[in-house]
């Protein structure tokens, strides 16, 4: 077997790969001859070249056809010329180990330490921490695959768990959150008559409680005028601190009461001396118009 020719095949692609494809610790290009037989267990160790090997090289070295990098998931192109076979290891090489290079390598190459020299014996141990373990094949996944991202999974899981946590409950509003016992009781305010401004109508459904002074002034006005004009009604309301509607309703009720007394008595009693005729029916209600001729019914009423 012509090892000089094989070394020339190895040297050419190694010198033309570029500085980013291999480690600084390169293996020597000349090897002592070996009588070991060619075996097929390391048939796919040519990881640096691309394309298929030539038939002549397969006959000389006894190696089967090399697999293209596309089948291994390595995205680097081939730098070997068309007339040369890809770089391959000598049969005297031991089992190879492949270690992925750093992130700066863009061609996705693997570091291939040599196991034949004593000066490079500890090289595989130095790179063993970041490698994929012993074996003739590189890992079946591209760099930064599931193995590299697995270390970030706990950190991402923690971030997701923090995002899914329920936010802190906001402080409850005191007026709406706290309900006291006295707030549950439905309270109906008492209906009390309040003095309204003159000229405004009183609320419906409320009974006005007149004072003694107001009743006295209204009775005096009723004895002289059973029907009031608009101007007189506004004047009386302003004097008695009432509104116009209250004065109007009081005079309506007072006229109805007078008619009821006339129907019950049959006739209007004669007016006492000194009293006007209009106030004859109301003689019993007037303290100034009393006479001994007044009927008992009118006095009691």
Swiss-Prot record:
Organism from which the protein derives: Pan paniscus (Pygmy chimpanzee)
Principal localisation: nucleus
Gene3D superfamilies, sorted: Homeodomain-like
Full protein name: Homeobox protein Hox-B1
Signal peptide location: none
Residue ranges of the region described as Disordered: 19-77, 127-149, 189-208, 254-301
Gene Ontology, cellular component aspect: nucleus
Alphabetic keyword roster: Developmental protein, DNA-binding, Homeobox, Nucleus, Transcription, Transcription regulation
């Amino acid at each position: 077997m012509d090892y000089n020719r094989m070394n020339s095949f190895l040297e050419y692609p190694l010198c033309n790969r570029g500085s980013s494809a291999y480690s600084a610790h390169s293996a020597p290009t000349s090897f002592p001859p070996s009588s070991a037989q060619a075996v097929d267990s390391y048939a796919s160790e040519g990881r640096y070249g691309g394309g298929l090997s030539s038939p002549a090289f397969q006959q000389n070295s006894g190696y089967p056809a090399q697999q293209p990098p596309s089948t291994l998931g390595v995205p680097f192109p081939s730098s070997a010329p068309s007339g040369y076979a890809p770089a391959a290891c000598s049969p005297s090489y031991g089992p190879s180990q492949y270690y992925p290079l750093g992130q700066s390598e863009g061609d996705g190459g693997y570091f291939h330490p040599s196991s034949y020299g004593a000066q490079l014996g500890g090289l595989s141990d130095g790179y063993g921490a970041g490698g994929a373990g012993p074996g003739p094949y590189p890992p079946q996944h591209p760099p930064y695959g599931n193995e590299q991202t697995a270390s970030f999974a706990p950190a991402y899981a923690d971030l997701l768990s923090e995002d899914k946590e329920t936010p802190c409950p906001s402080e409850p509003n005191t007026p709406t959150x706290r309900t006291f016992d006295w707030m549950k009781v439905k309270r109906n305010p008492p209906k009390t008559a309040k003095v309204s401004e003159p000229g405004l109508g009183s609320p419906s459904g409320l009974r006005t409680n007149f004072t003694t002074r107001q009743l006295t002034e209204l009775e005096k006005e009723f004895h002289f005028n059973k029907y009031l004009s608009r101007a007189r009604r506004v004047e009386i309301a302003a004097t008695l601190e009432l509104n116009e509607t209250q004065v109007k309703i009081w005079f309506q009720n007072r006229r109805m009461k007078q008619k009821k007394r006339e129907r019950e008595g049959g006739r209007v009693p004669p007016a006492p001396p000194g009293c006007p005729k209009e106030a004859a029916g109301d003689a019993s209600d007037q303290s100034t118009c009393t006479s001994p001729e007044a009927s008992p019914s009118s006095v009691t009423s």
